[in-house]
């Protein structure tokens, strides 16, 4: 009987790896470990933000599903407004949204004006931080919710701190809470393809003397590490009509992005009572790329003169829906942006993105 030829070191390594993979699959199930080339490469599923410029700045057309995102900025900068617009876009695509209102400050009438279907929105107003994050975990595990927004990290107070004496120090309690919760949440978020957005506030660092950024966000460093997207939103200009203030010019900077190049910016108007002005973006971006021609203060679309001054053109486009949709279609085609859809998590079961948490 002929002897089997001795295995080369490389063949022995391959056989050992094959045995290990078989053992892992028997113990933990099919697809527990695989080569990246074996998985289905699909476009990252996203939920649009409601802002064309911000979708463009994010590089993938919106907030990625199956990942953690953070929106932070000063007070009254538009953090909750942006989050509500993302919820509205999710609902337009047939998705289910949940809003965990740790601040107990959600204005449902304002949310409705931004396009949120409040009768379909799941809302929770938890008593303490552990409860809020536990509710978020259960919603994500259900795989039946497309987006969960937590407003805000600063309001996620540990139960021990709430039950303590006013003024008593609980050093690092919130940071430990966030670190523990995110360790638990991230794997589930990825499997369920739920988009989870944390709204955060900024604080001034104590003792910073001239070097480095004096601002920091609340809740420790865990959220910074676990977030795939971090957006810094700021009001940069007050919009006035004579003496009447009607909105603010807002800048969003993508300071961290694991799914596309970071440090891109978006500029848009937030109008009081109606939120992000998509029509204003059509004018700004359309002028930048040449879809809308600007001569002095006059604007034109093709052979059609739109009017003089941005506010007059904005009013015209809001009244003339057919014209507005035509401008938007031309702009989106020029920018190469694809329409989004809510993806069933089961469609991409086991699929891996190029960059994990």
From Swiss-Prot:
Keywords: ATP-binding, Cytoplasm, DNA damage, DNA recombination, DNA repair, DNA-binding, Nucleotide-binding, SOS response. SUPFAM superfamilies: P-loop containing nucleoside triphosphate hydrolases, RecA protein, C-terminal domain. InterPro entries: AAA+_ATPase, DNA_recomb/repair_RecA, DNA_recomb/repair_RecA_CS, P-loop_NTPase, RecA-like_C, RecA-like_N, RecA_ATP-bd, RecA_C_sf. ATP binds at residues 73-80. One of its GO terms (molecular function) is single-stranded DNA binding. One of its GO terms (biological process) is SOS response. It comes from the Bacteria. GO terms for cellular component: cytosol. It is found in: Cytoplasm. The keyword DNA damage applies. PANTHER family: MITOCHONDRIAL DNA REPAIR PROTEIN RECA HOMOLOG-RELATED (PTHR45900:SF1), RECA (PTHR45900). Belongs to the RecA family. Can catalyze the hydrolysis of ATP in the presence of single-stranded DNA, the ATP-dependent uptake of single-stranded DNA by duplex DNA, and the ATP-dependent hybridization of homologous single-stranded DNAs. It interacts with LexA causing its activation and leading to its autocatalytic cleavage. This is Protein RecA. It comes from Nitratidesulfovibrio vulgaris (strain DSM 19637 / Miyazaki F) (Desulfovibrio vulgaris).
């Amino acid at each position: 009987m002929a002897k089997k030829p001795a295995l080369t070191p490389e063949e022995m390594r391959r056989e050992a790896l094959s045995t290990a993979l078989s053992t892992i699959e028997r113990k933990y199930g099919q697809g527990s470990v695989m080569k990246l080339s074996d998985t289905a490469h699909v476009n990252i599923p996203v939920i649009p933000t409601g802002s064309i410029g911000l979708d463009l700045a994010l590089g993938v057309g919106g907030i990625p599903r199956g990942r953690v995102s953070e929106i932070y900025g000063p007070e009254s900068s538009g953090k909750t407004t942006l989050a509500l617009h993302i919820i509205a876009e999710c609902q337009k695509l047939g998705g289910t949204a949940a809003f965990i209102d740790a601040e107990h400050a959600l204005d449902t009438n304002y949310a409705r004006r931004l396009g949120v279907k409040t009768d379909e929105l799941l809302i929770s107003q938890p008593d303490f931080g552990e409860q809020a994050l536990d509710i978020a975990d259960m919603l994500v595990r259900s795989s039946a919710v497309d987006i969960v927004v937590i407003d805000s990290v600063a309001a996620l107070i540990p139960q021990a701190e709430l039950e303590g004496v006013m003024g008593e120090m609980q050093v690092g309690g919130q940071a430990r809470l966030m670190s523990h919760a995110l360790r638990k949440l991230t794997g589930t978020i990825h499997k369920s393809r739920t988009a989870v957005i944390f709204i955060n506030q900024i604080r001034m660092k104590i003792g910073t003397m001239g070097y480095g950024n004096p601002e920091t966000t609340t809740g420790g460093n865990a959220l910074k590490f676990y977030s795939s997207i971090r957006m810094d939103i700021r009001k940069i200009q007050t919009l006035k009509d004579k003496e009447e203030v009607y909105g603010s010019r807002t800048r969003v900077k993508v300071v961290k992005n694991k799914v596309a190049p970071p440090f891109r910016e978006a500029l848009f108007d937030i109008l009081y009572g109606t939120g992000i002005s998509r029509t204003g973006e059509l004018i700004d971006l359309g002028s930048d790329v040449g879809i809308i021609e600007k001569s002095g203060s006059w604007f034109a679309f093709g052979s059609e003169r739109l009017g003089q001054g941005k506010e007059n053109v904005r009013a015209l486009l809001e009244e003339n829906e057919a014209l507005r949709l035509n401008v938007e279609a031309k702009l989106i085609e020029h920018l190469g942006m694809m329409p989004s859809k809510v993806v069933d998590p089961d469609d991409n079961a086991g699929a891996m993105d190029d960059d994990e948490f």
